[in-house]
């Protein structure tokens, strides 16, 4: 009997082993795919998330996180998700061709997500060789350029295609072949002006925001009966808003903000009853609001900065004169027609030129030998003349001393030796340059007190008509102008999307009895006139514009500005003056940090803090800004109100969701995912930790905000409503 029991126990154990064996083998990756993953690690140049991989790594058992995930089935990789935090391209030896060639070896992939990893270059045509099972492809926040290859439409099983925030340009290929596609996100590129030729009929979410699409809103959209979210904001669409757009049966979220749309909003009783958010702000619309929205309290309608007739409404102050919109609309239409004619003319000219070229080639061949001889002789002569000129080339630099101007000569440096950041312009900015003191005196009306807009900060206007601010920093006498000039290279690098960028500088010397007697550096920066975050949080009219997605966009803009100051220049800039007064917003609500530390160790005043202390102090100040963004309350960093509010938020995380919701700014009610709000609050509290060693790094700050934005986007695109922001 005892022997029988042992036998039964052994049999059960053996059967259990056989039962578990398949599941173990399913998670054991075949050796060829293990080698492929190590190749991918190498091509991505060992990002932090993948740095621990080795030949002995059991990839299928690696723990998942929001930034990393590998799933296996039957010995094959079915999902590869890697999210980095690179803000610059991978070094020159990187090859997108090589990377995607390696990726094709993962033949069973269903999900491929490579985000913020510095991938650059064109998207190669071998993308067609990716797994035929691929359902989700996310290559967002990289530096991929060129056209989107037409081969991408051969990935028949794709349900989600996200290529947002890259450098794609030109037209979008025909996507009708992607019959299973439900999500298409091409936002934040340079696509256009032609719109997408044909779209997949089963699309649920489309984002084409922040591109250069022009002409009218395409008629083909009216066939997308399953469409729930459509974001065409920040493009150049013209014409009127088509009536069918408000009648799409499933549409919940529609953003047409920041285009050139004109005419009146469709006044139709057929307005979609499911529509929750309609954002038509910053267009050229006239007339009245649609009557079909008057009885729909559940619909949020954003319409600021148009020319609408809304007398009696608080938003009337945010409407422009009708004549402004009418004139701008005419110019927009004329520009589109001009572009179309130019394109047609170029096509005609191409045909004519082709015939001419064939005839001319024969003549060119006959005379080319003679010309070549003449050119060689001419080049020798010009070279002998140019070489001494290059050595003696001088520029006149004006240096003012009290009321007397003296002119001294300074050799212009060889442009090949000038730092790249000083030679090349950042998008939207003029190239960095050295100003004369005379130019700045003229721009500021001799530093008139009427132009003073802050401590030692003047607003002015350059001769070219560019509005600027001039920041005056008095320097220690012991530092010579020559030594200071060597420090200017760092200044030239302070040019970033989320900074009030430096346009140039001037080092001048005034005599005694002048406010800036001695050596002074004058730093010329952008002028941002749309107000600060403080203005938006204290003016209830402006505050209404800042819904949750816009606030998250502002938060990550601040974080990326700080990240650039810490890691985008060498040495990093720490201990910055981070307050909501210094978070400026341009007309598109893009963040521009001002008042940050200028890296001049020789300036009068305290030295910069150490890197670690300065970073943690910046993170703390960011936490204070984040608390104000969440609650809508303006508070001081060292106030008791901050401590009390922090404690309330901490306690609310352990309570019912309604408690935390009650602490959020009422202006964002109904526009956020609760999980996005909760995660943001948790992270803000971590930034305010008394023990600075426990505060997150700025890289953690950016990563966590990206995660909260992803949570918000998922909530928006799945079953709820949302708002389009410049970073979302």
Swiss-Prot record:
The lineage of its organism: Eukaryota, Viridiplantae, Streptophyta, Embryophyta, Tracheophyta. SUPFAM superfamilies: L domain-like, Protein kinase-like (PK-like). This is Probable LRR receptor-like serine/threonine-protein kinase At1g14390. Residues 421-709 form the Protein kinase domain. It is an enzyme of class 2 (transferase). Glycans are attached at residues 55, 85, 138, 169, 210, 253, 267. Its main location: membrane. Keywords: ATP-binding, Glycoprotein, Kinase, Leucine-rich repeat, Membrane, Nucleotide-binding, Receptor, Repeat, Serine/threonine-protein kinase, Signal, Transferase, Transmembrane, Transmembrane helix. It is found in: Membrane. The chain crosses the membrane at residues 357-377. It comes from Arabidopsis thaliana (Mouse-ear cress).
């Amino acid at each position: 009997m005892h022997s029988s029991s042992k036998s039964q126990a052994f049999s059960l154990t053996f059967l259990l082993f056989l039962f578990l064996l398949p599941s173990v083998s399913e998670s054991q990756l075949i050796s060829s795919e293990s080698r492929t993953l190590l190749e991918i690690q190498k091509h991505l140049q060992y990002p932090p998330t993948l740095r621990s991989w080795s030949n002995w790594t059991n990839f299928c058992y690696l723990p998942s996180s929001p930034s990393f995930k590998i799933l296996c089935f039957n010995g094959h990789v079915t999902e590869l998700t890697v999210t980095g935090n690179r803000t610059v391209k991978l070094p020159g030896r990187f090859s997108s061709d090589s990377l995607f060639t390696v990726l094709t070896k993962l033949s069973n992939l269903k999900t491929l997500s490579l985000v913020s990893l510095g991938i650059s270059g064109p998207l190669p045509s071998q993308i067609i060789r990716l797994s035929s099972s691929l359902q989700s492809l996310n290559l967002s926040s990289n530096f991929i350029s060129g056209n989107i290859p037409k081969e991408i439409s051969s990935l028949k099983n794709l349900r989600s295609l996200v290529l947002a925030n890259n450098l794609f340009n030109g037209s979008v290929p025909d996507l009708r072949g992607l019959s299973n596609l439900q999500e298409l996100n091409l936002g934040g590129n340079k696509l256009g002006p032609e719109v997408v030729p044909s779209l997949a009929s089963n699309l649920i979410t489309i984002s084409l925001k922040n591109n250069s699409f022009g002409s009218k809103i395409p008629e083909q959209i009216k066939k997308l009966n399953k469409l729930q979210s459509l974001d065409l904001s920040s493009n150049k669409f013209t014409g009127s808003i088509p009536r069918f757009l408000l009648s799409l049966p499933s549409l919940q979220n529609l953003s047409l903000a920041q285009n050139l749309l004109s005419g009146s909003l469709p006044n139709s009783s057929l307005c979609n009853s499911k529509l929750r958010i309609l954002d038509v702000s910053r267009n050229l619309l006239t007339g009245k609001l649609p009557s079909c929205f008057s009885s729909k309290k559940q619909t949020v309608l954003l319409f600021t900065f148009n020319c609408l007739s809304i007398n009696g409404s608080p938003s009337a102050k945010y409407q422009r004169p009708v004549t402004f919109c009418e004139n701008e609309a005419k110019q927009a239409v004329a520009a589109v027609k001009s572009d179309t004619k130019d394109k047609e003319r170029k096509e005609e000219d191409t045909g004519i030129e082709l015939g001419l070229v064939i005839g001319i080639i024969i003549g060119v061949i006959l005379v080319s030998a003679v010309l070549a001889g003449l050119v060689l002789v001419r080049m020798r002569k010009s070279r002998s003349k140019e070489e001494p000129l290059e050595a003696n080339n001088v520029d006149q630099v004006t240096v003012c001393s009290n009321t007397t101007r003296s002119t001294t000569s300074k050799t212009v440096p060889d442009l090949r030796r000038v730092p790249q950041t000083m030679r090349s312009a950042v998008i939207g900015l003029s190239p960095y340059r050295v100003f004369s003191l005379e130019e700045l005196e003229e721009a500021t009306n001799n530093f008139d007190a009427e132009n003073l807009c802050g401590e030692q900060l003047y607003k002015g206007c350059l001769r070219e008509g560019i509005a600027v601010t001039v920041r005056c920093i008095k320097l220690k006498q012991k530092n010579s102008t020559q030594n200071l000039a060597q420090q200017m290279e760092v200044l030239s690098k302070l040019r970033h999307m989320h900074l009030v960028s430096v346009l140039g500088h001037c080092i001048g010397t005034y005599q005694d009895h002048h406010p800036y007697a001695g050596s002074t550096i004058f730093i010329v920066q952008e002028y941002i006139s749309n107000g600060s975050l403080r203005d938006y949080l204290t003016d209830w009219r402006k505050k209404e514009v800042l819904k949750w997605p816009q606030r998250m966009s502002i938060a990550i803009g601040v974080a990326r500005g700080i990240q650039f100051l810490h890691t985008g220049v060498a040495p990093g800039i720490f201990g910055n003056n981070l307050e909501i007064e210094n978070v400026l917003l341009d007309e598109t609500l893009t963040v521009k940090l001002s008042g940050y530390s200028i890296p001049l160790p020789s300036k009068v005043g305290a030295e910069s803090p150490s890197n670690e202390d300065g970073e943690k102090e910046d993170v703390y100040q960011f936490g204070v800004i984040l608390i104000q963004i969440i609650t809508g309350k303006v508070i001081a960093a060292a106030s008791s109100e901050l401590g009390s509010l922090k404690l309330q938020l901490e306690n609310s995380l352990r309570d019912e969701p309604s408690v935390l919701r009650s602490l959020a700014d009422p202006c964002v009610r109904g526009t956020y995912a609760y999980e996005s709000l909760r995660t943001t609050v948790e992270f803000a509290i971590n930034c305010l930790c008394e023990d600075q060693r426990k505060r997150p790094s700025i890289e953690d700050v950016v990563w966590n905000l990206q995660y909260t934005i992803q949570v918000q986007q998922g909530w928006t695109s799945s079953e709820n409503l949302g708002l389009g922001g410049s970073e979302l």
